Amino acid sequence: MATLKEVQLKIGSVKKTRQITSAMKMVATSRLRGSQEKMDRFKPYASKFSEVLGSIAGKAGEEASPLLVPREEPKKVNVILCTSDRGLCGGFNVNLIDKADKFIKSKLQDKEVTFTCFGKKGRDWAKKMSMTIDDQYLGVVGGKFDFSVASTSGQKLINRFLEADVDEVYLVYSEFKNLARQEPVVKQLLPIPSLEAMEKPDEAGAKEETAYLAEHICEPSSDALLGEMLPKNIFIQIYDALLQTSTSENAQRMKAMENATKACKDMIDELQTIFNKTRQAGITADLMDIVGGAEALN
């Protein structure tokens, strides 16, 4: 059985750990609030842009942009993998990496796969698997970033697609549903899916708005306008994915630190019980010695 001093030291150590996890939970909560507000502010713009794009797509032809044209035999694929730079966020990074790994093995087995990595965890995994990393952006997910990160990385991939250096581009990120639910998803960025998909509004209210927009005349033409808007749409999707992944990371880190803090409390309660039992056993043994000595004197 451990001595009283040993148990006291363990209790002190766990209390210090609880202070750290509690502080980390508070930081994660603050960051979650900030990233969620940023995501919510961006959502109306992205939604309206999608509505306008959908209305123009209904008038444009399939040859309006080379970004719409799929390759006959795609061989070169780039996967944008969004992960965090740090751990201590539950299964957040593991789930994203597992999603990317399963997607590659099931859909891209016979293709030349390269990576654009947002975050150290994804980059380290790609290196460990001897994958080719074309580009990497660290300190983005979970940190401070703006739209320029998405436009810079997106423009590089668009240029490579137009130069036939890459045939397809996929985006792996964490979709933020709510505080209790975040799901890793895979989305195709290039070539851009069919125009018919753009015409379908996501919400019932957007249908009337799209019909209203369809009455407008596009100058110089729908094809020309669509050609200008499609690259911007790529940037918006990347930026939205980064916002959702950052929010998901902070939500999972907050939950992980909350669970760790609760685990510390439970451990302290257990150690305190052990401490009390050990002290009680020591007192009982001392009393037995005193009683035994008194009887011996009598």
Swiss-Prot record:
<dbReference type="GO" id="GO:0042777">
    <property type="term" value="P:proton motive force-driven plasma membrane ATP synthesis"/>
</dbReference>
<keyword id="KW-0139">CF(1)</keyword>
<keyword id="KW-0375">Hydrogen ion transport</keyword>
<keyword id="KW-1003">Cell membrane</keyword>
<keyword id="KW-0406">Ion transport</keyword>
<comment type="function">
    <text>Produces ATP from ADP in the presence of a proton gradient across the membrane. The gamma chain is believed to be important in regulating ATPase activity and the flow of protons through the CF(0) complex.</text>
</comment>
<keyword id="KW-0472">Membrane</keyword>
<dbReference type="InterPro" id="IPR000131">
    <property type="entry name" value="ATP_synth_F1_gsu"/>
</dbReference>
<dbReference type="GO" id="GO:0046933">
    <property type="term" value="F:proton-transporting ATP synthase activity, rotational mechanism"/>
</dbReference>
<dbReference type="GO" id="GO:0005524">
    <property type="term" value="F:ATP binding"/>
</dbReference>
<dbReference type="InterPro" id="IPR035968">
    <property type="entry name" value="ATP_synth_F1_ATPase_gsu"/>
</dbReference>
<comment type="similarity">
    <text>Belongs to the ATPase gamma chain family.</text>
</comment>
<keyword id="KW-0997">Cell inner membrane</keyword>
<keyword id="KW-0066">ATP synthesis</keyword>
<dbReference type="GO" id="GO:0005886">
    <property type="term" value="C:plasma membrane"/>
</dbReference>
<comment type="subunit">
    <text>F-type ATPases have 2 components, CF(1) - the catalytic core - and CF(0) - the membrane proton channel. CF(1) has five subunits: alpha(3), beta(3), gamma(1), delta(1), epsilon(1). CF(0) has three main subunits: a, b and c.</text>
</comment>
<keyword id="KW-0813">Transport</keyword>
<protein>
    <recommendedName>
        <fullName>ATP synthase gamma chain</fullName>
    </recommendedName>
</protein>
<dbReference type="Pfam" id="PF00231">
    <property type="entry name" value="ATP-synt"/>
</dbReference>
<dbReference type="GO" id="GO:0045259">
    <property type="term" value="C:proton-transporting ATP synthase complex"/>
</dbReference>
